[in-house]
Amino acid sequence: MYKRQEHYEAVIQNYVSVDVIAQTADFSRYKVIIAPMLYMFLPGTADKIRIFIKNGGTFIITFYSGMVNENDLAFECFPPFALNDVFGIKAEETDSLEDSDENSFNWEGKTYKVKRYCDLVQLYGAEVMAVYEQDFYAGLPVLTKNEYGSGMAYYMAARSDVDFLRDFYARVLCDTEISQIVKSEYVKDVMVKERCDKEKQYVFLMNFSRDSREICGETLKGYEVKILEKYL
């Protein structure tokens, strides 16, 4: 089963604040929107995504996106529905792998595994960032990006792992100048959250390991939580 939570986990491991929103939400409040496996498009969703990207937003979708309408009826076109020109690709078919099967791709000098779902996409103007390395679709795009208007549209054609997602989202967050809650690379088992009022920022450092961890000059004992305060 595909777990959208993997994307959430990867983003919060970059120590940024995250909202979980619906398709009906106001997209204009955000600089980056990640919509993994957005299988069903509600009426108006495609237009909202198009406008968001055109106006300078960064939008990321994956395989199995834009396939059916609100009645679970398939669109009569290649996914993602009404957005082939925006994302610069057409997803023509999906190879569903057995649990024991894997593929791989190389991105920025590092090899990552692919599992379960592999879209076979044709380029429609997008730039290829990585390609499959095995099987009959070796050489086909697995990760693409496409400039549209003032924004950027990314397409992930396959399911990878949290390690890749964390690395990839780190790059996207850097490119879009989204600030970290704390300036730090990921520390295993440490979660960082923030809350703010009119005067202060409260940063919660939480260690979910029995072993001690260090982050931002702070040492956390096993399962310890520290709260840092800073005036805004």
Regions found by a protein language model. Name each.
Residues 1-232:
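Carbohydrate-binding surfaces of carbohydrate-active enzymes
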